[in-house]
């Protein structure tokens, strides 16, 4: 199967046989250690990265640095983002065969001339010949204010919804995985209404989208990101209903997604908030030596013959 990882960038893993693991991670700087550790005996087959500067970073990461032994290839967008960051997907060729790759550029409502990260869409065939459609996203931040920037995230969600609906029309059983840093919570308008991502605990239909972390919204001590002492999920997996059907040829193991929160990814929060928080690389211009201000998330896919 497979394991899917997301970091503040994104990571995904396929184990030989029955499980595909998908991971979403934050930035590339933590990719080297976290996916290797998170994969256990086998590295993630797919690794999604939400924030990476350029092609050369991924080349060094996969061909020269710590991930070289895992024989990853990569796909990266060429966004016109104001901050110079892109989304990307690492994959192992013996675990998934890439059929097509494309990127979509959202038009932002707040300023048509303003740019953000492109949405990466990769279509691949896994070991049982089932088709998997993977989207890697990084929605516009809240830095300029939640209300002011909300329309931009809604625009991105509407674009994603359009692409997902197109796949629902052309595929008999669409296997869609949308992952990324959405800069919104599962129950925010952009994801709940514009994208239409529901709770996995609601009635499931093959033609709808479901948020693997929607039902975590009210839990106070879990999340991928900590802001002012409160944990929450702005990093999420959103999937098509077919992946929640245990009789499908691809399904999500245990209908669960997880946060990877090993001690090396955490350090003590300040005295005001207490507890721990993700061990980030920088605080302003000060180098801290950590991995990311987001924790990776992951889930396993069961792949049937």
Residue ranges and their predicted role:
Residues 1-65, 75-80, 85, 270-275, ...:
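N-terminal, active-site-proximal structural segment of metallo-dependent hydrolase catalytic domains
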Residues 1-17, 100-102, 131-141:
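Active-site-proximal beta-strand elements of phosphoester/diester hydrolases
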Residues 13-22, 43-49, 76-77, 108-109, ...:
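Second-shell loop/turn segments in exported
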Residues 46-48, 52-139:
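Structured beta-strand-rich core segments of catalytic domains in phosphoester-bond hydrolases
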Residues 56-59, 83-86, 143-146, 185-190, ...:
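Extracytoplasmic/secreted cell-surface and envelope-processing proteins
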Residues 74-76, 120, 124-216:
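Extracytoplasmic, non-cytosolic globular domains
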Residues 114, 165-176, 184-305:
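Metal-dependent phosphoester-hydrolase catalytic domains
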